[in-house]
Structure formats: C-alpha cells, structure tokens
Amino acid sequence: MRYSDALELIAHKRSLLDRIPVGSILLPTHAEFDRMTTKHRTDADRLSRAIELAERLDCYIILRGTYTAICLPSGLALFDISGNRGLYSMGCRNVLVGVIAGLIGQGYESVSAATLGVHLCGLAAKLHAGRHSERTLTASQLIDQLGSAYRQLEAH
C-alpha cells in the first residue's frame, strides 16, 4: 500500500483516525488533510485543526507550505523555512517520507526525525536551486543533494 492510499482510506473512513498509532508521523497534502477532516477555508484554519488533531491523536502532522509546519502532540507547532516551491514536484513528498523513515530507523525519536527530515529536504532543495532553479527540482535531484545538505548541517 502506498502512503497516499493509507491517507485516502482514512479520508473515506474517518473512524480510522483514532487507530493511528501513538507517535506516528502523518504527511498529508492540504487536499488529503481536508478530506481526512473537513474542508478548510484558510491555511490558518487548516493549521489550527492539524495542531488540535496532533494533540488528540498523540501524533505528528506535517503540513508543507511556504513555511512547513510540524504539529506536535503537545499542541504546539514548529515551523521550518528552509525549503522552496521545488519541493512540490512529483515524488518529493515520497523522498521526505523516506528520509524521515530512515532517521527513525537510525534511532531518532519521532519529533527529531520529523524536524530533521523536513530541514534536510528543505536544505537539499535550496542547494539544488543555488546551482540550477527551484522550479526544475525533481525527486532524484533532491536525493542527490541530501548528502551535501547533511554535511552542511554537520559542519554547523
């Protein structure tokens, strides 16, 4: 099952939301999030609902946007400003899911994996844009920049 298929199942049967394991990390598109919950008129409404839902479900919800929001089970949200619009290219969300899963596999806690994963992908997108253009970013090019992004973080 693909990640987006699981979110679509939740959208069609909202009672599945309550079966999401504690500490899970959800990364829906805005449209998927609206289908999982309700249609939101503004980004602020969507963010508010995501924060409430993350707290209720004791999970993490990542909403990508100009500033990517990482909604925490504590009822707070962290914002990452490292990315660019190139991250909306086909497959880039799958790269982010893979990076976060890889970090969890390395022993990172969910909150650290989510924040580091979002920041690494954002930094990789900026590195690509510095050499090319943010509009030309593909998922494979994002992957190609991850090593450089990680090294840059380690240097600081």
Identify the role of each PLM range.
Residues 104-117, 126-131:
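Phosphate-handling active-site elements
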Residues 84-100, 110, 135:
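Short glycine/threonine-rich catalytic loop with a Thr-x-Gly-x-Asp
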Residues 1-82, 153-155:
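Glycine-rich phosphate/dinucleotide-binding loop and adjoining beta-alpha-beta core of small-molecule
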Residues 96-104, 117, 121, 142, ...:
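Buried hydrophobic packing segments
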Residues 38-48, 107-112, 133-137:
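Short, charged, surface-exposed loops that flank catalytic or proteolytic processing sites
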Residues 3, 94, 113:
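Hydrophobic, well-ordered secondary-structure elements that form the walls
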Residues 123-156:
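Charged C-terminal helix
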Residues 48-51, 78, 97-98, 111, ...:
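Feature representing long, continuous alpha-helical segments
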